[in-house]
Amino acid sequence: MNSTLFSQVENHSVHSNFSEKNAQLLAFENDDCHLPLAMIFTLALAYGAVIILGVSGNLALIIIILKQKEMRNVTNILIVNLSFSDLLVAIMCLPFTFVYTLMDHWVFGEAMCKLNPFVQCVSITVSIFSLVLIAVERHQLIINPRGWRPNNRHAYVGIAVIWVLAVASSLPFLIYQVMTDEPFQNVTLDAYKDKYVCFDQFPSDSHRLSYTTLLLVLQYFGPLCFIFICYFKIYIRLKRRNNMMDKMRDNKYRSSETKRINIMLLSIVVAFAVCWLPLTIFNTVFDWNHQIIATCNHNLLFLLCHLTAMISTCVNPIFYGFLNKNFQRDLQFFFNFCDFRSRDDDYETIAMSTMHTDVSKTSLKQASPVAFKKINNNDDNEKI
């Protein structure tokens, strides 16, 4: 899912635009193959909006969490890691990919040729596995509240492991990414004189296909299946818990809270899958048979798929932060340039659970009326 994301731009341009057949190259000189200015302008606005929202949204989340010491729990530590990786994607992935795809030649130098896809692959791997760690933390918080629960130290260790894995899985881009003018050497058109392309040059097509297939599993299908399983189990547990609580407390409040949580859980999984699905399909098709994709429609189709995937950098802060009332409140202070004030008694302590984390099936049966009343009172303040 990397050639998928990064080298795909390079490879698409090289293999599609500069094949051994001059007809393909000449096709790009045909006016019918150039994107209309109106389309380029629209895409530029869309990419600009995603970059601005992705950078500002994730930066705001990072600052708000780091500013508040009482917010440095496992969930928020993982959210900061997620936001940081999304921030890198918004900075390193969107502008370079957009410019290179439109220009069909590389203008950012040899060092950036190697660094750009490497950083992009690292960032996306970190982002996706941050979602996995958050799913694990939610799972333990709700499914097994009396069992093993990750603490801050576990979160930091998990983040370190993610970054090591991301760097290791991205090393082929540092090794095989090259900047060359070879595709233009036999071209007599002045427009392509002194032009370079940046793409991966694996030892063979089988090596490239093996690597891109591995990334496809590592960066999409594997994490998506795992996240879906975790949130499905959470959904089932919350539904059962809701049925138990309906017998002992106000049904209207409990039903609305459960509905809200279920929608959030569904939205998290759907947003992740939907944002990345078009680019995943596009890259899979291109990797195995790039001739299926029409030369003239290639760049536009890729940019649309890529833009859809990059929207995930804006969606994540909304789901993991701005739907939380604490973040909404602190965001007002953030944009008003006011000091952040500590509000320990005011802060939510549970992001997805409708019950206190110590309340399980067993504890519900054993709780005394007085204790249960206290739990209810506390629970009213622990909303998403």
Swiss-Prot record:
A lipid is attached at residue 338 (S-palmitoyl cysteine). Glycans are attached at residues 2, 11, 17. Signal peptide: none annotated. GO terms for molecular function: neuropeptide binding; neuropeptide receptor activity; neuropeptide Y receptor activity; pancreatic polypeptide receptor activity; peptide YY receptor activity. This is Neuropeptide Y receptor type 1. The gene is NPY1R. It is found in: Cell membrane. Disulfide bonds join 113-198. The lineage of its organism: Eukaryota, Metazoa, Chordata, Craniata, Vertebrata. Keywords: Cell membrane, Disulfide bond, G-protein coupled receptor, Glycoprotein, Lipoprotein, Membrane, Palmitate, Phosphoprotein, Receptor, Transducer, Transmembrane, Transmembrane helix. GO terms for cellular component: neuron projection; plasma membrane. Residues 66-76, 138-154, 233-260, 321-384 are cytoplasmic. It holds the Pfam family 7tm_1. Belongs to the G-protein coupled receptor 1 family. Residues 1-44, 98-116, 176-211, 282-299 are extracellular. It comes from the Eukaryota. The chain crosses the membrane at residues 45-65, 77-97, 117-137, 155-175, 212-232, 261-281, 300-320. It is a multi-pass membrane protein. Gene3D superfamilies: Rhodopsin 7-helix transmembrane proteins. The modification Phosphoserine is found at residue 368. InterPro entries: GPCR_Rhodpsn, GPCR_Rhodpsn_7TM, NPY1_rcpt, NPY_rcpt. Receptor for neuropeptide Y and peptide YY. GO terms for biological process: adenylate cyclase-inhibiting G protein-coupled receptor signaling pathway; feeding behavior; G protein-coupled receptor signaling pathway, coupled to cyclic nucleotide second messenger; glucose metabolic process; locomotory behavior; outflow tract morphogenesis; regulation of blood pressure; regulation of multicellular organism growth.
